[in-house]
Amino acid sequence: MENSSVRGAATYAGVALVAALLGAAAMWMHAEKRVNAARSQSTDAVTTHGEWVKIKRGKDTIRAYVAYPERKTKAPAVIVIHEIFGLTDWEPTVADRLAKEGFVAIVPDLLSSRHGQSPKNQDEARKLIGELDPDSITADLNAVYAYVNGLPAVEKDHIGTIGFCWGGGQSFRYATNNPNLKAVVVAYGPPPDSAAIKRIQAPVLGVYGENDERIDATLPDVAAKMEAAGKTFTHEVYPGTGHGFLKPGRQGSDGPQVQKAWDRILEFYRARLGK
C-alpha cells in the first residue's frame, strides 16, 4: 500500500513537471510570435537575420534572441539587457537596430532560467525581477557572454553591453564582474556599489534623460568615484527627455534626442569594439 502511494505521488509529480514544462514552452512560443510580429513592423529587421536560441547554464536554460548583420567579416557583439518589465517586444528591435549597424546583438530573457516563462504583465515582471539575486544574474550573463563569444560570426573578445532602466544598472554592475568587456553602455540605470567600481575595466558611457532626477542625482557622485578609481566614464544628459526615453511611449521618445543618443552610442561602440 505504501509503495502504491509512493508511486502515485511520483507519477503526480512527473505529470506536474511535464505540464509545467509544456506550459513554459507554450508561453515562450507565444512571446516569440508576439516579438516576431513586432519585428515585422521594423525596417531594421529587413536587413538583418534574427533567431531564437536556448543557452544552457548548468541545469537551467536561458532563452535569448540573436540578431546578425549582413556582412562578410566577423562582427563585434553587444549583449542587450532588458528593463525591469522583462523581455518585451521592444528589446529584440534594439538588437535588430544594432545588427543593422554591423553588430551581432543578443537579448537574453533573464527571467527564463529562474522561472521558465514570460511574465503575464508588468506587475508580475517587477515581482519576478525582484526575486532574482545578483549572483544568478551574473551567472546568466556569463553564460550569454560565453555563448556569443563562441559564435563563428563574432570577433572574439570584442563584446560590449547595453542595458535600459533596471538593465542599465545590470549593465553597469556586470562591468564590475566581467573584466573582459570592452564597452559598457548604461541607459538611465543606477550605478554599482562604490567598492565594486574599482573592478571595472571597460570604458562606460551613460545615457540619461533630463527629467529623471532619481537617477541623475547619482551622476556627480558616480563620476567622481569613477575618476578617482582611474576609470573611463562619460555621460550625456538629453534635454526634454525622461526616464526610459529610448523606448517608444516614454517622455521624449518621439523627439530628436533619441537619434542623437543612438548616434552617440554607436560612435562609442565603433571606437571601442570596432566596426
Per-segment meaning from a language model:
Residues 227, 232-275:
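C-terminal catalytic histidine-bearing segment of alpha/beta-hydrolase fold enzymes
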Residues 141-145, 219, 223, 266:
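Generic structural signal for well-ordered alpha-helices
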Residues 4-55, 62-65:
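An N-terminal hydrophobic leader/cap segment in hydrolases
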Residues 200, 206-208:
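Short beta-strand/loop motif that positions the catalytic acidic residue
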Residues 103, 110, 189, 238-240:
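Active-site loop/turn elements of alpha/beta-hydrolase fold enzymes
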Residues 39-46, 52-150, 247-249:
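Serine-hydrolase catalytic machinery in alpha/beta-hydrolase-like enzymes
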Residues 141-201:
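Primarily recognizes the serine-hydrolase "nucleophile elbow" in alpha/beta-hydrolase
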Residues 211-216:
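Acidic catalytic loop of the alpha/beta-hydrolase fold
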